[in-house]
A protein has these predicted regions:
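Structural and coupling elements of P-loop NTPases
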Residues: 1-690
Length: 690
């Protein structure tokens, strides 16, 4: 069945891990009649969590699209993971949604995941609605949670449905719009008398009326005259407030026991904006272009998620903003400027894929086997090429080195990782030019563990992880002059080269070469060979075999043989001079230093500063950021940062994040030299290069 954009609601379901997002999505799907049996996260039978790792871990790891069709309205629910290592799912889903349904556990209250979901909605100018789950449990405290929300989310919070525990221990739900109460028997709604909740009832009605009055001048006037709003006025005012961002309505219920979900679904329809009201703003030739959900307009479709399947191929999840998308549509990729050949169009519900002739404006679907399109791309009618903004992903700061488990799989790793990165843009992969290690980056330990499992299960590539090597450097502290004399007689022409070279420390991280030879003791045509020998030798320091930096080599004197001297002979002579001089020039180890910017709540700044000092770092200052966090700026050795991702997450309960970028090299403390040298020996860094 096709839906007009006014009858489509695209909703990101977000919140803390374990708060009940997936169970709520499953319950709404079951309520719509799309499934005969309600799945359970514990059993691995929900529509949302179908990935083998999700089933094994009993937690969402990827965003999934679950369309719920109910009473003429299509709700495209995008179930986002709540675990902090998988925030990419919410970052993708928000790009396809007009609204965010924030789930809050009736047991745990307002946790960090709920705060992050609220902030994500604010940043992206999306309508917000809260659903407090598990309110039928004995230890659930709705009104305590409501106060938490007012503190964390501010004055926009407005309760619309509240629970009341009855004498028999069951829970009834009071709809403040209609001022009627209901209990649920086997998921079926039964109206009852409104339970007595004391002074709270009048206070809740008053607070709701005030919030609604502020959305419209006529309603404000009626409110001040002391007149009660009609149910229609309440709904209209509430909808206006939700769509403008003035009001965050709060509902509650139980997904497991199918309680108050009918009220939630009804109000998702009447309060949240439809796909027809959500205009997108793209860019064409540097100018902003507004796109409306008009099926007759030129095609504009956004790729918000990619799944790499080794059997089916690439599956691109798409929201059509205007026009219609079908396999015969002409489309240009705004990023590449090239035509994009479209595969078959699909509707998707979890892992279930169904062919559909087209995806209409405002709706979400998928396209198979797009050749070049990736997440964040815009597909357009060639007559109107518009680029929409790319998703903003969390920063991947947790780095590990890749080690192939099976011999012969080395060539498969980069290809498999490239496929994985298509579906998870928070995974990064590079080959370190110096250490030659393959480095994979992600959001944390769990993130990389799941990435490894996907590589094995999807692409048959098994890898393990190890701590990345630190790219140390070596330098010298004082000047030293030495001779390098290379003489070899092998019958016929021999080899002869003789040089005196002065080695001295200089500023910077390069190798400088100069010559100060008088009288032709070393012919000019051999100067490049001497420089080449010095530079080759400097690739390996004498302490731990790391590259030498901050050194100047000056050719002072030497001698040559008119027959036996050659370029190779002077290269070897320069290397011998290097090996003779550097041990006497006060060799030192240098370690890389990075600039740390840790974004943390104000309460955590003292702990961060202490941790920086503990890690041999220096705090440089502190400034607020645009999100209300404090940015602690510091410089810290790279070697001390390997587990900082885990530390920061535990300290801030997931609220904080950081960036870390290389700045320069500094002298390694002498007390640490022996350990680094020992590690270098184990790696074979000190192999003779002659």
């Amino acid at each position: 069945m096709g839906y007009a954009s006014k009858d489509i609601r695209n909703i990101l379901v977000a919140g803390h891990a374990g708060c009940g997002k997936t169970t709520l999505t499953e319950a709404l799907l079951y309520m719509s009649g799309a499934t005969e049996r309600m799945g359970r996260v514990e059993d691995g039978t929900t529509a949302s969590d179908f990935d083998p790792e999700e089933i094994r871990r009993k937690a969402s790891l990827n965003s999934s699209v679950v369309p719920v069709e109910y009473e003429g309205v299509k709700y495209n629910l995008i179930d986002a993971p709540g675990l902090f290592d998988f925030e990419t799912g919410a970052a993708e889903g928000i790009m396809a949604a007009e609204s965010v349904l924030i789930c809050v556990s009736g047991r745990s209250g307002v946790t960090v995941g709920a705060e992050k979901a609220y902030q994500l909605a604010l940043k992206n100018n999306k309508a917000r609605m809260v659903f407090v789950t598990k309110t039928d449990l004995e230890n659930a405290d709705y009104f305590k949670i409501l106060e938490q929300m007012k503190i964390k989310f501010g004055p926009s919070v407005c309760p619309c449905v509240v629970p009341a525990r009855l004498d028999d221990g069951t829970v009834a739900y009071i709809n403040l719009f209609s001022q009627k109460a209901f209990k649920y028997e086997g998921g079926k709604q039964v109206q009852i008398d409104v339970p007595d909740i004391g002074h709270r009832f009048e206070g809740l009605i008053q607070a709701m009326s005030e919030a609604i009055a502020e959305t419209d001048e006529a309603l404000m006037e009626k409110f001040f005259e002391g007149e009660a709003f009609t149910t229609e006025e309440i709904v209209q005012g509430m909808a206006a407030g939700v769509r403008s961002g003035q009001i965050t309505p709060v509902f509650c219920g139980s997904a497991v026991n199918m309680q108050a979900l009918d009220m939630l679904l009804y109000n998702m329809n009447v309060l949240l904006p439809g796909a027809d009201t959500a205009a997108a703003v793209g860019e064409a030739n540097g100018e902003p272009v507004e796109i409306t959900a008009d099926p007759a307009a030129p095609l504009c479709a956004y790729v918000f998620k990619t799944v790499a399947d080794p059997f089916v191929g690439k599956l691109s999840f798409i929201k059509v903003l205007s026009g219609k998308l079908s396999a015969t549509s002409s489309a240009v990729n705004a990023r590449t400027g090239q035509p994009e050949r479209l595969g078959k169009t699909l509707t998707v519900c979890g892992k279930k894929q169904t062919d559909t002739p087209e995806i209409a404006a405002g709706d979400i679907g998928a396209v198979a086997k797009l050749a070049t399109a990736k997440t964040g791309d815009t597909l357009c009618d060639p007559a109107r090429v518009v680029a929409l903004p790319a998703p903003v992903y969390p920063i991947s700061c947790y780095r590990m080195a890749v080690k192939v488990a099976k011999k012969g799989d080395e060539g498969k790793v980069s290809g498999a990782l490239a496929r994985l990165m298509e579906e998870d843009p928070a995974i990064n992969f590079v080959v370190d030019a110096e250490t030659k290690q393959q480095i994979i980056s992600g959001l944390g330990t769990q993130h990389l563990e799941v990435a490894l499992a996907k590589l094995k299960n999807k692409f048959g590539v098994e890898i393990t992880l190890e701590t990345p090597r630190v790219p140390y450097r070596e330098s010298i502290r004082k000047s030293c002059k030495a001779q390098g004399r290379h003489k070899k007689q092998t019958g016929g022409h021999g080899q002869f080269g003789d040089v005196w070279i002065q080695f001295e420390p200089v500023e910077g991280e390069g190798i400088e070469f100069a010559e100060n030879v008088f009288g032709g003791s070393v012919p000019k045509n051999f100067f490049p060979a001497v420089e080449k020998g010095v530079r080759q030798a400097a690739e390996h320091g004498v302490l731990a075999g790391y590259p030498m930096v901050g050194m100047k080599a000056t050719l002072l004197d030497g001698s040559y043989h008119p027959v036996d001297s050659s370029e190779m002979a002077f290269i070897m002579a320069a290397k011998l001079a290097y090996k003779a001089a550097i041990p006497e020039a006060g060799p030192i180890l240098l370690e890389p230093i990075g600039a740390l910017k840790a974004h943390v709540p104000a309460d955590n700044t003292g702990d961060i500063m202490g941790e920086v000092t503990k890690r041999r770092g220096r705090v440089l200052g502190m400034n607020p950021d645009e999100d209300g966090l404090q940015v602690v700026e510091a410089e810290v050795p790279v070697a001390e940062m390997q587990d900082f991702t885990t530390f920061l997450r535990q300290l801030t309960q997931g609220r904080g994040y950081f960036t870390f970028d290389f700045v320069r090299y500094e002298t390694l403390p002498q007390m640490l030299e022996a350990k680094v040298i020992e590690q270098a020996k184990a790696l074979g860094n000190l192999a003779d290069d002659e």
